[in-house]
């Protein structure tokens, strides 16, 4: 493996930072990680999938992989629309990726209006095209396509709006992501070398095999480390998100080194950082547990995050998006927050740099609800129980596409200050609700609520509800309330 002087010096700097601590590249040392307070309090963030794959805008963000798999819809669409893959390959979308209407300030203002507190633009997806200025490859948005440091512009705009800038790297999967292009006449063929867009295009493994061959090489892993540390140093993100292939055995030493480097940089900056990971890629307690398009069925004693998309069928913009409703997204947010989690909601901008009108409308609807009910979400903590009600929920990844059919008996709880927030997931037409977890009990040995409620209100309404408590629960009458969204009852405790 040949490295230039910049790369050699950078690796030496990485080693120096890791050696200096306070974090070192062992799980024992990384276990000293503590979730940053800002993340625990923020609760709601925005994810952004925007890149070359936004140009074809067909099916989903895996277009660059699937356009090279014979028989796939993307393969057939590509040949019908652009020509054969040897004449028009994925790289040929770069001149069409102009981002001519991209305004980072407009995006950041929209996210602020949506009630988000932090934003994760994707720095590099599986396709290998960097959305930032890089010294490690020419295949980036600064030198090609829009000729802009889109990630840098977003960082400035996001922070100017008072939001927290984070970012994600999906580079690990690039090891194999474009490999099917070698199976027929296309523009992906040897020789390939480090720095090329299509390098290394190795055979795609079974994703469940964490020791798959061909084993990622030292050259590839070094490149992954350098790219990640470049993002860390150039953009100083408050948190990093990694997608799924970093759980492969080959990544472990490099992953630990990167984590130590990043956490040490955070210590130098005077603001702790965090890594979001899936599939036990990292040792539990050394970062933030992530669940893609799903959640836990029960409250967790640790800080975690669910990442999902505004559309059910894609993370990037396409012309066939199947959108979730604002109600469905708000139900997910409330349920996740009650279980000690955060929700990271993805939107996919168009290749011209605009965010679709439907996305904007949904985000503003969410923001309107949060403007009224945010005290039950932001900086809240789980109550002694997260929920009551009859509806059973699915848990795990890829389980959130269908809206859960909640009833007026399904309630979620959060707490903050002297208040318990009872969030009714489906408000009944007659305005009558019973919160059974706030019943009166004569047996103080039972581990239930035994406090005194001095006042009850409905967030967003000036009129006070009628209420009383007995052994069956807290009975609320609020016929003046009408909403398709979750309704928050605020119970102030003596």
Q: What are the language-model segments listed below?
A:
Residues 2-494:
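Mature catalytic domains of secreted/periplasmic carbohydrate-active enzymes
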